[in-house]
């Protein structure tokens, strides 16, 4: 998936920068780079965009599996690079993940191969996300919506609408002449909280219906 490729690209870049800082004995700069990556790009962006997939997709869905694979690489990369700075915390995290016999301080720095991404598209996409978030905040302040999932968005950019929907956390995105945000006029799925034009007979959306059926079959 495009979002996972982008996060692997960013992880590869950040970890490379951190090792460069460590090699120059600028440990405070390495820590700062990791701190900003965790706060801005993981917590405020990737985790926010993908929590819906982790919570609501079928356990074996391709998208959820890809997301978990990226999370594993993020964990290994962050913990090994934080180990010189936070030896006890990273040791505890590593043993919790891999068992009491494992020791992060016996590991080398974990890196990931760089993934090719369309840099111009991502620059435009992140700029659009900022614009959408500003409009969503205005709508929220006016009492129009609560969560972003209550909104639908019309974009004025030539970008993949599903990718825009994912990174903005809204229920529907379409293309138009100008950027517009509004409360979605459809039905709320009580399982994933996204809005749709119609729900299934089970009272939930098609995606959730299929995920529940898969869980019951297992």
Q: Each predicted region: which residue ranges?
A:
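Short helix-adjacent coil turns
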Residues: 22-29
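Processing junctions and N-termini across compartments
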Residues: 183-186, 198-202
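A broadly conserved sequence feature marking short terminus-proximal activation segments
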Residues: 140-187
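Acidic, turn-prone loop/beta-hairpin segments
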Residues: 1-20, 47-142, 146-152, 178-180, ...
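Hydrophobic residues within the alpha-helices of tandem HEAT/HEAT-like
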Residues: 38-39
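Short cysteine-rich clusters marking metal-coordination/redox-active sites
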Residues: 189-192, 205-208
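Cys/His-rich microdomains that often coordinate metals
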Residues: 196-199, 209-212
């Amino acid at each position: 998936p495009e979002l996972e490729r982008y996060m692997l690209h960013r992880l590869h870049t950040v970890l490379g920068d951190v090792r460069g800082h460590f090699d120059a004995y600028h440990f405070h700069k390495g820590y700062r780079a990791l701190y900003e990556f965790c706060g801005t790009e993981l917590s405020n962006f990737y985790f926010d965009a993908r929590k819906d997939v982790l919570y609501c997709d079928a356990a074996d869905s391709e998208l959820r599996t890809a997301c978990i694979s990226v999370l594993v690489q993020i964990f290994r990369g962050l913990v090994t690079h934080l180990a010189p700075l936070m030896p006890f915390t990273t040791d505890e995290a590593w043993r919790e993940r891999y068992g009491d016999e494992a020791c992060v301080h016996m590991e080398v720095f974990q890196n990931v191969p760089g993934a090719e991404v369309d840099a111009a598209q991502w620059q435009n996409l992140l700029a659009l996300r900022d614009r959408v978030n500003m409009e969503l905040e205005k709508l929220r302040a006016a009492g129009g919506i609560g969560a972003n999932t209550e909104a639908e968005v019309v974009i004025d950019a030539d970008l993949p609408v599903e990718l825009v929907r994912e990174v903005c956390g809204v229920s529907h995105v379409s293309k138009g002449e100008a950027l517009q945000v509004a409360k979605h006029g459809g039905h709320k799925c009580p399982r994933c909280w996204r809005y749709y034009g119609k729900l299934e007979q089970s009272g939930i959306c098609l995606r959730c219906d299929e995920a529940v059926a898969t869980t019951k079959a297992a």
